[in-house]
Amino acid sequence: FQIGERGGQDLRGYMVDALVKAVFLPDSAAKPWASAGCLYFSGDDPDSTDDEGWNPLWARYPQFGLSDLLIYTYDADGAGRWSNLAAPYLSAGFVPHRDARLSLMVSHLLAPENDGPGSGDQRGWYAGASYQVVLARAPLAQRDELKGHLQAELLEPGDYYARDRHTGYFLRWELCYSF
């Protein structure tokens, strides 16, 4: 909960981050898992003089799943301002081999307050995939590692956004050498 006052305006924001996770075959090499959760950031009611929106100063970035793409949908509120979001989601993953991990996620995105540039409260659908792998251990020295990361995301925006909305795509690959 966030309670206070700023410039004579009452502040009352809140968030919920709930998750249930199951690991199947924990003794297997693949260690498959699945989870269901919901992330909720209160939104500011446009019909109220109070500010009920969650202030992201107290949130992690990007808190939602794998998303580098979703954070850019908050540009109207200020870049990186996580607020007014209800996001139930499903995720799953496994370890395809000792040095790799694959994760998948899908979420239906909603806006608790209908204050967007569009006519509705449907923020849309999000899907993401992440593959992380250690490519080499000790290539030059005992503690060295070469790691790789591939991330892909898709955001199908809903009626919360303006009519000229388009599907968003994000793809990132990364190589990291640590010593």
Task: Place the predicted regions along the sequence by residue.
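Residues that define the transmembrane beta-barrel architecture of outer-membrane proteins
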Residues: 10-16, 84-88, 121-127, 165-171
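Extracellular/periplasmic loop regions
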Residues: 2-94
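Surface-exposed extracellular loop regions of Gram-negative outer-membrane beta-barrel proteins
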Residues: 1-19, 131-139, 143-152
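Transmembrane beta-strands of outer-membrane beta-barrel pores
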Residues: 1-5, 24, 38-44, 106-112, ...
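Predominantly the C-terminal beta-signal and adjacent terminal strand-loop region
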Residues: 136-179
